[in-house]
Amino acid sequence: MKAIVFAYHDIGCVGLEALKLAGYEIQAVFTHSDAPGENHFYASVAKAAAEMDVPVFAPEDVNHPLWVNRIRELAPDVIFSFYYRTLLSDDILQLPSFGAFNLHGSLLPRYRGRAPVNWVLVNGETQTGVTLHKMVSRADAGDIVAQSVVEIDDEDTALTLHGKCRTTAAALLAQQLPLIRSREIMLTPQDESQASYFGRRTAADGLIDWQKSAREINNLIRAVTEPYPGAFTFLGERKVVIWRARVLKNDSVKANGVKQEPGSIISTSPLVVSCGEDALEIVSGQSESGLYMSGSRLAAEMGMVPQAKLGNLASRVQRRRTRVLILGVNGFIGNHLTERLLRDDRYEIYGLDISSDAIARFLGDPRFHFVEGDISIHNEWIEYHIKKCDVILPLVAIATPIEYTRNPLRVFELDFEENLKIVRDCVRYNKRIVFPSTSEVYGMCDDKEFDEDTSRLIVGPINKQRWIYSVSKQLLDRVIWAYGAKNGLRFTLFRPFNWMGPRLDTLDAARIGSSRAITQLILNLVEGSPIKLVDGGAQKRCFTDIHDGIEALFRIIENRNGQCDGQIINIGNPHNEASIRELGDMLLTSFNAHPLRDRFPPFAGFIEVESSSYYGKGYQDVAHRTPSIRNAKRLLEWEPTVKMEQTVAETLDYFLRTVDPQHADNVTDTQG
């Protein structure tokens, strides 16, 4: 059986050797060039492949069409991935006749994602394992071929646990590879209800929080001790790395019978530190520039004394809040995002918009700073605040379909030209930008689900001017990506899929046709006019509750471990798919059950209209728009939870309660 192998790390070498022993014809090996600055304690896949006289490659982008074609020409029967760090595209996964298989270092579906050996130790697990599974487009989500359990002892570190997993993986592969070769495997679907995702870890994640229990801190130390960068703390301005420790119970560590504050040094020989629960004896460690030594010698070298405190870097104890600049802060996303950020004391918000009705409730908050202004005029204010702030969100855009055909040049000027200035300022001042792309960039993509990394972006002919919004946003996406690749711009692109909820827009906007679909439908119900179904309302969309969407966006801004940097993330709810006609029916049901129903006119029915008469000749519609949310799940540990019926009811309730009572009465009388 012909095999192509994607491999890295010790497990990659184990996989190669197992394939050789099982009699596979290894056509090629793909691996990674070693990253500078990384501690390479593991064996080299490139060297192992060379010793087997197998062609070996380390492309920067293995999913590039050139490499896909080269793999296609080899016509593999099977593909194996052993700790390869890049997600393989569907184009590659579909090439082998018998499929693709991956070896993952956990008992799937738990601990999908990155660094599972480290994460199980951090979380205090007593068991982990290795899993051989079929590869699908979602990382670590395919059907299971087989898995083996690895027991975790209290003294295990990431290195010893990795050794156990390596031995277990070799045994598992020796058992399963012959069955794959003879095509005799049995597959078991993963239980999605048990799935968990974990992102990559960085050296900064080793910072010790002494408020945690001694057991939790010791778990962190075990997870990141040598050969990893180590768990660390600070004595004043000096960094202290802790390599090994042991948990001591409270009764044995009270100073003068009194429990000490977390982080307080209880004794120096042995070196014992108080924790949120119990205490920790530092067995070995070192100062940032010192040698590896015992805990007591470390205490002597650094001048530690009882009751001194370990903790965060002293100069950072009063850490400055993250400053977030929101341009378009009064808009639908802007005002909901402000509300979410203000619930977290770590953030300070600076906002600009041409009005303030939606954010009036925040104007007295000392962490919210608002200026009324226009992004096309207040260039100096914007540049100054880009320099001042940490995270930039330019949310200003014309984003209603009728405007794409009615005012295409204005759409281009605002959505592209004005936002390009902001992007360039972020590059100039080295600021992180979280940019609102759009589901519109996928255009008429024919994929079942729109994938950020693989789906084609398909738009219509030039005479269909509705696409000017889509291509303006797409070009900015590409410019931002290029600035990231060439100038080191830190960015995240997020693509909202039909977010709905209170304060979406206004009924006045709907009266001139410049609103979202649900607002237009609500206006029809409020005024007693027929609901217009453009081209019959068969178009399907996936509607996302604003609270679900904002929580995902908040996690992007939070950006734990930097894992959102350089990423494109769809934020939508693929389970809430409905046609516009179905949305209208759902809205009507909610409207008829609403306590204010009797204050509004009778329902005037549905009528079908052509898109050209409603939007203009330059319009072209899209049959469906369904997001893949694998990136959001993987990077944000996020999934939408709010059902569409709840979102529709809450959105309707908001609009009905904002209608002027006198106006509502007048509407009823007029229609009567």
Swiss-Prot record:
Keyword hit for Transferase: yes
Keyword line: Antibiotic resistance, Lipid A biosynthesis, Lipid biosynthesis, Lipid metabolism, Lipopolysaccharide biosynthesis, Multifunctional enzyme, NAD, Oxidoreductase, Transferase
Binding residue positions for NAD(+): D353, D374, I375
GO cellular component, one term: membrane
Active site: H104 (proton donor), E440 (proton acceptor), R625 (proton donor)
Site location (Transition state stabilizer): N102
Highest taxon in the source lineage: Bacteria
Binding site residues for UDP-alpha-D-glucuronate: 399, 404, 438-439, 466, 498, 532-541, 619
Documented EC number(s): 2.1.2.13, 1.1.1.305
Residue positions binding (6R)-10-formyltetrahydrofolate: R114, V136, S137, R138, A139, D140
Spans annotated as Formyltransferase ArnAFT: 1-310
Keyword Zinc belongs to the record: no
InterPro entries, alphabetized: Arna-like_SDR_e, Bifun_polymyxin_resist_ArnA, Epimerase_deHydtase, Formyl_trans_C, Formyl_transf_N, Formyl_transf_N_sf, Formyl_transferase-like_C_sf, Lipid_A_modif_metabolic_enz
Catalytic activity: UDP-alpha-D-glucuronate + NAD(+) = UDP-beta-L-threo-pentopyranos-4-ulose + CO2 + NADH; UDP-4-amino-4-deoxy-beta-L-arabinose + (6R)-10-formyltetrahydrofolate = UDP-4-deoxy-4-formamido-beta-L-arabinose + (6S)-5,6,7,8-tetrahydrofolate + H(+)
Region called Dehydrogenase ArnADH, residue ranges: 320-672
GO molecular function, one term: UDP-4-amino-4-deoxy-L-arabinose formyltransferase activity
Gene Ontology biological-process annotations: lipid A biosynthetic process; lipopolysaccharide biosynthetic process; response to antibiotic
Associated pathway: Nucleotide-sugar biosynthesis; UDP-4-deoxy-4-formamido-beta-L-arabinose biosynthesis; UDP-4-deoxy-4-formamido-beta-L-arabinose from UDP-alpha-D-glucuronate: step 1/3; Nucleotide-sugar biosynthesis; UDP-4-deoxy-4-formamido-beta-L-arabinose biosynthesis; UDP-4-deoxy-4-formamido-beta-L-arabinose from UDP-alpha-D-glucuronate: step 3/3; Bacterial outer membrane biogenesis; lipopolysaccharide biosynthesis
Site (Raises pKa of active site His): D140
Family of this protein: In the N-terminal section; belongs to the Fmt family. UDP-L-Ara4N formyltransferase subfamily.
Assembly description: Homohexamer, formed by a dimer of trimers.
Its biological purpose: Bifunctional enzyme that catalyzes the oxidative decarboxylation of UDP-glucuronic acid (UDP-GlcUA) to UDP-4-keto-arabinose (UDP-Ara4O) and the addition of a formyl group to UDP-4-amino-4-deoxy-L-arabinose (UDP-L-Ara4N) to form UDP-L-4-formamido-arabinose (UDP-L-Ara4FN). The modified arabinose is attached to lipid A and is required for resistance to polymyxin and cationic antimicrobial peptides.
Name of the molecule in the record: Bifunctional polymyxin resistance protein ArnA
